[in-house]
Amino acid sequence: MGTLIILEGGDGSGKATQTKLLVERLTKEGHAVESVSFPNYDSGAAMPIKMYLAGEFGKDVHDVNPYVASSMYAIDRFASFRTDWEEFYKNGGIIIADRYTTSNMVHQMVKYDDQKERTAFLDWLEDFEFKKFGLPTPDAVCLLDMPLEVSEALMAERTGKTGGNTGDIHEGNHQYLVAVHDAYEELVERYQWHRIPCAIKDKANQYALRTIEEIHNDVYQAVVNLLP
């Protein structure tokens, strides 16, 4: 089997950039490596996800049950695995994923306030994707930890450049995003993810973004010992 490394984090945390840099570095080192990104919007399997995020099943994130929403995302990952990277992975290749089941965990668990319901959901999701669907379990998860206030500022800048609303019911709900950001802490502890800080406070107690290179080096150091 191969190696599966996940880059996780909220919007604006730089997952795509860090995925690209890690793939480039590992390729230069002679590793067989490919990248994937979820949801895979180029696949027909992602159509229900597009409808969900566009609010066609309900304008509020709580309108769709976490188990139903999770099923949509699981099918998308299953289709990607079976058609795009299963053979490469099973032959020992390294897969760098921009989001994975990990995103489903955080975005859906926050729909529950009760800790027992959250734990039951996470247990179910692990069994559903990694056993029922047979998807690979990650070897490492790097959480690109971006302070929410910085992330929202970056998202506002990005939205301004692209001309308005992203059409994503998740991104449009501030209270939901706060809950997601806070819930990452629970997942870091439960699954022993690698936390990679994307911003640090300066002497004026203001957040300052770390450089892309600094973040990349932290990601690399977190996974280098896993490489074949």
Where are these regions (language model features)?
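Extreme N-terminal, non-catalytic leader segments
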Residues: 1-3
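NTP-dependent small-molecule kinase module
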Residues: 23, 149-228
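P-loop (Walker A) phosphate-binding loop of NTP-binding proteins
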Residues: 10
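Hydrophobic positions on the alpha1 helix immediately C-terminal to the Walker A/P-loop
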Residues: 18
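Conserved lysine of the Walker
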Residues: 15
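Hydrophobic anchor at the beta1->P-loop junction of P-loop NTPases
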Residues: 5-7
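A glycine- and Lys/Arg-enriched "phosphate-lid" helix/loop adjacent to the NTP-binding pocket
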Residues: 102-182
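ATP-dependent small-molecule kinase phosphotransfer cores
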Residues: 29-133, 208
